[in-house]
Curated annotation (Swiss-Prot):
Component of the DASH complex that connects microtubules with kinetochores and couples microtubule depolymerisation to chromosome movement; it is involved in retrieving kinetochores to the spindle poles before their re-orientation on the spindle in early mitosis and allows microtubule depolymerization to pull chromosomes apart and resist detachment during anaphase. This is DASH complex subunit ASK1. It comes from Eremothecium gossypii (strain ATCC 10895 / CBS 109.51 / FGSC 9923 / NRRL Y-1056). The lineage of its organism: Eukaryota, Fungi, Dikarya, Ascomycota, Saccharomycotina. One of its GO terms (molecular function) is microtubule plus-end binding. Belongs to the DASH complex ASK1 family.
Amino acid sequence: MARQPPAPEPTLEQLDQEITLQLQKIDANLSACFSKITKDIIPAVARYGAVCDDALSACSWLRELFQKSSDIQLATEPAAPAPAAESLFPQAPAPRAPEVTTEGHVLAVPVSSDDEPDDGSTLQRQHKRRKLSLQLQQRYGSSSSSSFVSRSPTLRTRPASSPLRAPDDPDPPAVLRFAAR
C-alpha cells in the first residue's frame, strides 16, 4: 500500500483563502483612505488655500503701501519758484495755516484785512503783524505769545480734564517706528 503524502491541496486552498482575505482587507482600507481624502482632506486644503490667497493679496497690498510710503520725499525747505510760464489753468494761492497761541486759541485776522487783496507785499505783511500784535495785546495783555501768562479767571480755575493728568503735564511725543530694511 502506498501511502500518499498528506493532502497538499487543502493547504494550498487554505493559503489561497488567507491571501484573498488579506487582499480584501487591504482593498477595504484603501477604499476608506480614498473616501477620507476626497471627503475631508481635499475640501479642507481647498479652504486653506482660499484663506492663504486672501492673506497673500492683503500682504501684497500692504507691501505695496509700505514701499510707496518709503518713496515719499518730505520737503524740508520750500522749492525755488519755477520760472514764470503762461498757463491755461492758473492756480489759486495755497490757503495759509491759521496762527495759534500757546494755549491753542486760533487768532482771527481782523475783518478789514480780509477785504484787502493779498498781494504779498512787505508793507501788507507788516500791517497784518501789527494788527495781530495789537489783537494779542488786547486779548491777553501781552504782545508776546511765547511768554503767555493767563490773566483770565476761567483759565486759571478750570479743572483738569482728567483726574489722572494735571493740566501742566506735557503731551507725550508721537513716536513712529518702521522696520529697517
